[in-house]
Amino acid sequence: MTRVPRGYIARRRRTKMRSFASNFRGAHLRLNRMITQQVKRAFVSSHRDRGRQKRDFRRLWITRINAATRIFKVFDSYSKLIHNLYKKKLILNRKMLAQVAVSNPNNLYTISKKIKIIN
């Protein structure tokens, strides 16, 4: 059987994969088969971790809000603060509350006091 040299289509496919693997090291950068395996693995990891990142940030925000509410002792816990926020129909998401809790805890204290006064 004669050798068939591959055309530009295969080369284009490999260079596309190579461009994804430009920051890899060693054989993961040089060998075509390793490049395809590692690029697939990287895409799987990035897809999985995009969902995980959302969960992790939400958990971090909840932890920060809970710590701030326990320090000021306005509400016993995070869950009571969130419950009262929903009851009063205040539109503050967890990300905003966590940012307030970290940057200026006194503002979180005043927000929670207002909620408690309205009760």
UniProtKB/Swiss-Prot annotation:
One of its GO terms (biological process) is ribosomal large subunit assembly. Its main location: plastid. One of its GO terms (molecular function) is rRNA binding. InterPro entries: Ribosomal_bL20 (IPR005813), RIBOSOMAL_L20_CS (IPR049946), Ribosomal_protein_bL20_C (IPR035566). The keyword RNA-binding applies. Keywords: Chloroplast, Plastid, Ribonucleoprotein, Ribosomal protein, RNA-binding, rRNA-binding. GO terms for cellular component: chloroplast; ribonucleoprotein complex; ribosome. Pfam families: Ribosomal_L20. It comes from the Eukaryota. It is found in: Plastid, Chloroplast. Binds directly to 23S ribosomal RNA and is necessary for the in vitro assembly process of the 50S ribosomal subunit. It is not involved in the protein synthesizing functions of that subunit. NCBIfam families: rplT_bact (TIGR01032). Belongs to the bacterial ribosomal protein bL20 family. PANTHER family: 39S RIBOSOMAL PROTEIN L20. This is Large ribosomal subunit protein bL20c. It comes from Brachypodium distachyon. The gene is rpl20.
